[in-house]
Amino acid sequence: MESTNRLSAIQTLLVIQRWIGLLKWENEGEDGVLTWLKRIYPFVLHLPLTFTYIALMWYEAITSSDFEEAGQVLYMSITELALVTKLLNIWYRRHEAASLIHELQHDPAFNLRNSEEIKFWQQNQRNFKRIFYWYIWGSLFVAVMGYISVFFQEDYELPFGYYVPFEWRTRERYFYAWGYNVVAMTLCCLSNILLDTLGCYFMFHIASLFRLLGMRLEALKNAAEEKARPELRRIFQLHTKVRRLTRECEVLVSPYVLSQVVFSAFIICFSAYRLVHMGFKQRPGLFVTTVQFVAVMIVQIFLPCYYGNELTFHANALTNSVFGTNWLEYSVGTRKLLNCYMEFLKRPVKVRAGVFFEIGLPIFVKTINNAYSFFALLLKISK
């Protein structure tokens, strides 16, 4: 049975990512002026906005008069540093990302074969879409709150601090600085959360394929050996493909998760430090925005850890699915085939971030612990 749209959860988001210069266009390999424009478009868009804006934020942090003033900018500067890593990674591996997306969507080896599999796949896609649309809209809401909250302050203040090369604390010039802040931050925010979504989706999709393998193994529970043996061979071949996809996924998501984990502890630390020195009574709008920002940051680091953990869990669960087959009724030759498969399953499936750690829930807990340790140290130093 022909499958439905296998990438339905992110189909719209893929189009948006091409329009904001994150992914290559589908027909970018053709010749012509339009193709050339498509190739330089990401740089034309992100150089004056994303990279210039991030450079101005870091300049503001470095030239701050004291540590407390720098802390007001550093929490966002480090966040955008993680974005730079994600951007450079997806641009450097743009062909690998496009190839993986195309294979997940069009390779007939991954076609769904019956109504039960289609129902399972569609439900899974809807669940992922629901989670990440909440995450995307929640993140954008935090940014919008930041843009608006400054209008409730007595003094002129920017939503997210950066170095402005002219005097902007006047009625005539304030909205120039504020407008650039809004446009650049919106692009940064959207790029950040969509790259998060793409990385998590790759892990989610491969975890779903491992679950599909488990379903097909368990469907052989009452199957005769004549039917089960060729089906087992097809399952083994599909498993080999999914293992290869896992390695390709690791290459794409490893730098992004590594940068996110490394920087998140500092981001949460400086955000908490900013809250301590800000106070709710003095700046209620910015205080609430910063609290929301911390909540989004915690979700941002939790999601890749969760989906990496899901991938590993469902890959390892295939051992139990093998025992769900009708193996006791099989011949010696088929049992030996299953035994070889069991030996193959002993090789653990793990997605690693660099060479340092496995992507999973334990690293999320460790990141939160590190953030608290850094925060306690920062408070002690600042006294």
Swiss-Prot record:
Spans within the Extracellular topological domain: 63-70, 152-174, 272-284, 380-383
GO BP: any one term: detection of chemical stimulus involved in sensory perception of smell
Membrane topology type: Multi-pass membrane protein
Pfam families: 7tm_6 (PF02949)
Cytoplasmic topological domain: 1-41, 92-130, 196-250, 306-358
Sequence similarity: Belongs to the insect chemoreceptor superfamily. Heteromeric odorant receptor channel (TC 1.A.69) family. Or2a subfamily.
Name of the protein described by the UniProt record: Odorant receptor 94b
Organism: Drosophila melanogaster (Fruit fly)
Protein's gene: Or94b
